[in-house]
């Protein structure tokens, strides 16, 4: 696969990807670390996408839609350390936002560690704005979350 951010390289996350997604997340300490049981418990509620080739996942994105509120929560976005700065995170986010628009989602929100300046810059570049703060949201280490939101144009 040539490196690049082409959305043609993004596909839906399927349950067979679970072990690769969990391994990828472990290689990214800033990503939310889910237990396999947590992921399996929520697999019906979570939509996800992966980017990679037949053997290796470069990154993944997981969201939960709250249809009654026309909202989507971005739960986790991670790109492996060896695959960063190639546009893969942007490709994943763009596919997710495109699907949100197509199903009538009006806003997207997320939480990010206050110390994760790289992620905050990434989301800001993609149109997200700070919308609040949640003290002591994260554990290991304890840290506040910055909440960010993005309004989708219909």
Label each region the model flagged.
Residues 1, 107, 113, 142-151:
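Conserved catalytic core of the tyrosine transesterase superfamily
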Residues 2-4, 8, 12-82, 90-95, ...:
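Acetyl-CoA-dependent GNAT
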Residues 68-70, 116, 139-144:
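Short acidic/glycine-enriched loop/turn segments that link adjacent beta-strands
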Residues 76, 120-122, 143-145:
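Short secondary-structure transition/capping segments
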Residues 80-94, 101-103, 107, 113-121, ...:
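Conserved glycine-rich acetyl-CoA-binding loop
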Residues 111, 129-145:
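Conserved catalytic-core motifs of GNAT/GCN5-like acyltransferases
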């Amino acid at each position: 696969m040539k490196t690049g951010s082409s959305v043609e390289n993004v596909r839906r996350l399927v349950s067979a990807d679970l072990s690769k997604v969990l391994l990828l997340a472990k290689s990214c300490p800033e990503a939310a670390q889910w237990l396999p049981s947590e992921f399996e418990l929520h697999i019906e509620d979570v939509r996800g996408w992966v980017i990679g080739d037949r053997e290796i996942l470069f990154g993944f994105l997981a969201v939960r839609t709250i249809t009654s509120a026309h909202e989507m929560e971005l739960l986790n976005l991670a790109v492996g350390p060896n695959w960063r700065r190639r546009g893969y995170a942007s490709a994943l986010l763009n596919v997710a936002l495109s699907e949100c628009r197509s199903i009538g989602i009006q806003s997207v929100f997320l939480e990010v560690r206050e110390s994760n300046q790289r992620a905050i810059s990434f989301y800001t570049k993609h149109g997200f704005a700070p919308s609040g703060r949640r003290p002591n949201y994260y554990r290991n280490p304890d840290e506040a979350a910055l909440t960010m939101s993005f309004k989708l144009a219909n």
